[in-house]
Amino acid sequence: MATVKTNTDVFEKAWEGFKGTDWKDRASISRFVQDNYTPYDGDESFLAGPTERSLHIKKVVEETKAHYEETRFPMDTRITSIADIPAGYIDKENELIFGIQNDELFKLNFMPKGGIRMAETALKEHGYEPDPAVHEIFTKYATTVNDGIFRAYTSNIRRARHAHTVTGLPDAYSRGRIIGVYARLALYGADYLMQEKVNDWNSIAEIDEESIRLREEINLQYQALGEVVRLGDLYGLDVRKPAMNVKEAIQWINIAFMAVCRVINGAATSLGRVPIVLDIFAERDLARGTFTESEIQEFVDDFVMKLRTVKFARTKAYDELYSGDPTFITTSMAGMGADGRHRVTKMDYRFLNTLDNIGNAPEPNLTVLWSSKLPYPFRHYCMSMSHKHSSIQYEGVTTMAKEGYGEMSCISCCVSPLDPENEDRRHNLQYFGARVNVLKALLTGLNGGYDDVHKDYKVFDVEPIRDEVLDFETVKANFEKALDWLTDTYVDAMNIIHYMTDKYNYEAVQMAFLPTRVKANMGFGICGFSNTVDSLSAIKYATVKPIRDEDGYIYDYETVGNFPRYGEDDDRVDSIAEWLLEAFHTRLARHKLYKDSEATVSLLTITSNVAYSKQTGNSPVHKGVYLNEDGSVNLSKVEFFSPGANPSNKASGGWLQNLNSLKKLDFAHANDGISLTTQVSPKALGKTFDEQVANLVTILDGYFEGGGQHVNLNVMDLKDVYDKIMNGEDVIVRISGYCVNTKYLTKEQKTELTQRVFHEVLSMDDAATDLVNNK
């Protein structure tokens, strides 16, 4: 690792007019922002519309994508790299911001390091044949992450995967959920960052197992920064030095991000806290007269269109879990500073304005860090844009700050907060871990550890429940044993996965844009949450009789009587939800995790709630799958799980009752996110548009200040979108943790989406009042 020399005059010129000094001595976007950002209290009236050039680029992107959807997407068979692939363009003469994922628009990259079988399957499913020479390398000579993982997997893990109790694990593709602070390239340039890595490498004096690994990782990060420089060179851009203006700042960030997208196909490739940094450059340029407002908006529009071109080669099996081809380019904005100042800037408005300028789209995943202390004009603008587009998600900074997520925190993937530059070394990145099916664990435990669908398949050891009527305390004790096995197995899988990922497919280019010494969250997830809670509630408050076959195997349940459901704002059942979340998290937290990670939990399913529903048998509160006589799975009666932390579709609560139930869940036990996806009818919010928007502001203020963490907000009537969704037309909606164009969903996923609750009243109290008044 060679010392890098940079002309100090370059920094003086690049940083002219910027305040503060401590961010100059060691890379820290957080400190730079604190010293330099300008809170904006005004409204959206300053915004500029699209240019003809922007609309032309948009047309090229959309027409190219449509063409490939009718034919096939081009795809590489060569192993991907950051800079050995030539530069690519959309329309070189008309682009303002350069850099795309490959040398051709929408050309898919071949990434075999996660697992050669999955990579080659993606090739074949896209209509291409693998290169025999590459196949030989990765089957005879090179070890993939998938190879390493399955060498180490325990028998418990294999049984859990086979039973679909533990599912969606990142054991054949990049793990994702790591966010580089890509604005570092813009503020400092690659030379500065490379020298900082040299200094960190040289500062390691003691040589032991941990320091040896760290020295190698720093070296890999240093090399990756060199590749980023080479990528810039391909486009005639010298990213060795810092950016001189907002256009270059956007350009440098795009080069850093596209370097990542060229070699890492994680389940999420988030952008981070970019708008507030760009706003500092923009304010300086506006004051200098370097660029006009229209020009700055055009740069943002061009950048966002680049982000919308990112696409990874996925298999059909992967698409079942993450439908609609999401890339999770989550872009976080607004929020609050530790000094009490809000962090809304004009650049936040500009990013949201792209929905109007270049059209509504799922990516980037626009995320507003919400607080009731944000300026009212901004909150009003956000709600009006959600009312119009249904493509923005909201996260509560008050709730997240209590768990140590600082003023420059951002959202990874879907709903998971991270604090990449946290100087206390907490929450810097996440080791992603998909989710486990807690309902299957409950049902399997009742059957003595035999799978709830395949009666002859033993998953784990536990005494079966033989009672004719299920007793709550007996079932709970049985379930706790199932949770012990489930969490132990889950931790083993995660430790193996992340050890092997670091060993065989280390994300050096992302890590190069982070502090050298970091600490990770290890993200564990739950699916089937509401059905599990409701099942326990039914057992406790109603009468639940197991229906057994001649061998005593439980294949169905008879539930008689009323019981409260999660989502109805009833403490009797909401307390069960609180218990389940805490019980799951505390079991995980008592384990030693890879690299001393911190155990976090998410209530999040993406579109995988449909896939998991198809792998789960009957419960006391829903119909699942069962086996035909020939052993095939019968899906004819299946009722789909609700997504994320959503209550069941059978819960009778209105939107406000739903919100109140979720507020009771302790974020301390779910640092990875508590995802609520809401569909609310405009008429439930008021008679006029202004009244509807104002009520949305009030509701989100109350939810987030009362302990809520996340809301996917869709403002729409089912009758207005049902036919469009089912007929495959373009409908942009927020689902569990991301945004999707519904035309890319499967028929089952479209059906599940339209079966969700579309709230036509805010509260069931409102419904009762309307009924009395004959409304």
Swiss-Prot record:
It comes from the Bacteria. It is found in: Cytoplasm. Keywords: Acyltransferase, Carbohydrate metabolism, Cytoplasm, Glucose metabolism, Organic radical, Transferase. GO terms for biological process: glucose metabolic process. Its EC number is 2.3.1.54. The active site is at C413 (s-acetylcysteine intermediate), C414 (cysteine radical intermediate). GO terms for molecular function: formate C-acetyltransferase activity. One of its GO terms (cellular component) is cytosol. Pathway: Fermentation; pyruvate fermentation; formate from pyruvate: step 1/1. Residues 9-626 form the PFL domain. Pfam families: Gly_radical (PF01228), PFL-like (PF02901). It is an enzyme of class 2 (transferase). It catalyses: formate + acetyl-CoA = pyruvate + CoA. The keyword Transmembrane does not apply. The keyword Zinc-finger does not apply. NCBIfam families: pyr_form_ly_1. Several mechanisms have been proposed based on complexes formed with substrate analogs. After activation by the glycine radical, the cysteine radical, Cys-414, can abstract hydrogen atoms from the other active site cysteine, Cys-413, and from coenzyme A, and it can also transfer hydrogen atoms to product radicals. The other active site cysteine can attack the central carbonyl of pyruvate and covalently bind the product acetyl group. Belongs to the glycyl radical enzyme (GRE) family. PFL subfamily. Homodimer. This is Formate acetyltransferase. It comes from Streptococcus mutans serotype c (strain ATCC 700610 / UA159). The lineage of its organism: Bacteria, Bacillati, Bacillota, Bacilli, Lactobacillales.
